Structures are given as structure tokens and as C-alpha cells.
């Protein structure tokens, strides 16, 4: 189970991630990871020198107005954001992972994530060729994972669609419904 979650959450472009969600019902166009925060005000911090900073900022704002809310640039942080240049050594353009790992799932205790032990990352090598809105879409997608949402392949118009060919740069109504169901 844990290994499957690792694949779902970490492989933005891997075929395995589609296989992992293929058996999930698609009627409600959101899926959940099986872990979430124990509170609805979720603090997120990104150091301002990072080149990814404006994308994380805009992506966090795009998730506003929900029952589960991102408290942007608040410390101590439940999760942090950064960018790395990993070239093609990984398949992901963005990842949500345990702090300091390449792509391991964050620790989950009693159905809740452990504050401070999660980070969201943009692989700058791959996203630097993207448009600004597409980069923001990858960032917002990772924040969706950080809420507790899993991939959903029902439509390219869903933010949690697993590939960067998604047609939205922020949460759609189905994505928001998923977060409101979680918190
Ligand atoms: Zn993803």
C-alpha cells in the first residue's frame, strides 16, 4: 500500500501512476491519498530567494476560499516548497515527498501527516521550458497532493490529472470538492 502511494504521489509523468488510479471509481472526480493533516489551516513556507517562489505563491492563492486553507508563508510550516534541477534523472516535473528525500512518501501517523516532514518540489530542468501558467499548474497540482488528493484521470480539466497536458493551472470544481470533503 505504501509503495503504491509513493508511485501515485511522486510520478507526475509515469505510466504507473495511471495504473495505480485506474481501478478507482471516477464518478466523483477526485481521489484521496489516505492521509491528510489533522487541522484545516495548513501552513506552507517557501524561501523567497527560490526561483520557484512566485509560482508557489500564485498556486497557493489559487487554492483559496476552501475549508482546508493554505496559510501562505507561515512558519513553522507543515510543508515547505523548493525547486531542484534534477535533469532527466527523475521522471517528475513536480513531487510531494518526505523532507530531504528524492521521492519517498511523507510519513503518515494515524491517518495524519507529521508537521514539518513534507516538501513540494519543482524539477526546474523540466519545467523551465514551460509557460508560466503551466509551471503554476504543476505547483498547484503538488499542493493538491499536499492537501491529501490523489490523481484523477477523468478529465484533463482537473488539476489532479496526472500529466502536464492538463488544461488548467489551478483547482477545478472537482478538485475543490475533494479538499472540502477532506477538511
Ligand atoms: Zn501528481
Briefly describe each language-model feature range:
Residues 1-37:
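N-terminal prepro-regions of secreted/extracellular proteins
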Residues 22-183:
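Zinc-dependent metalloendopeptidases
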Amino acid at each position: 500500500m505504501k509503495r503504491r502511494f509513493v508511485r501515485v504521489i511522486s510520478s507526475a509523468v509515469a505510466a504507473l501512476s495511471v495504473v495505480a488510479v485506474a481501478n478507482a471509481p471516477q464518478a466523483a472526480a477526485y481521489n484521496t491519498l489516505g492521509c491528510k493533516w489533522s487541522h484545516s489551516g495548513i501552513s506552507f513556507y517557501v524561501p523567497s530567494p527560490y526561483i520557484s517562489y512566485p509560482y508557489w505563491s500564485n498556486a497557493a492563492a489559487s487554492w483559496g476560499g476552501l475549508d482546508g486553507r493554505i496559510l501562505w508563508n507561515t512558519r513553522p510550516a507543515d510543508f515547505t516548497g523548493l525547486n531542484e534541477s534534477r535533469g532527466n534523472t527523475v521522471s517528475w516535473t513536480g513531487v510531494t515527498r518526505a523532507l530531504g528525500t528524492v521521492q519517498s512518501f511523507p510519513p503518515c501517523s494515524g491517518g495524519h501527516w507529521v508537521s514539518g516532514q513534507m516538501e513540494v518540489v519543482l524539477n526546474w530542468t523540466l519545467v523551465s521550458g514551460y509557460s508560466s501558467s503551466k509551471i503554476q499548474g504543476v505547483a498547484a497540482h503538488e499542493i493538491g497532493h499536499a492537501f491529501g488528493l490523489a490523481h484523477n484521470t477523468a478529465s484533463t480539466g482537473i488539476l489532479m490529472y496526472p500529466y502536464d497536458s492538463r488544461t488548467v493551472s489551478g483547482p477545478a470544481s472537482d478538485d475543490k470538492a475533494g479538499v472540502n470533503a477532506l477538511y
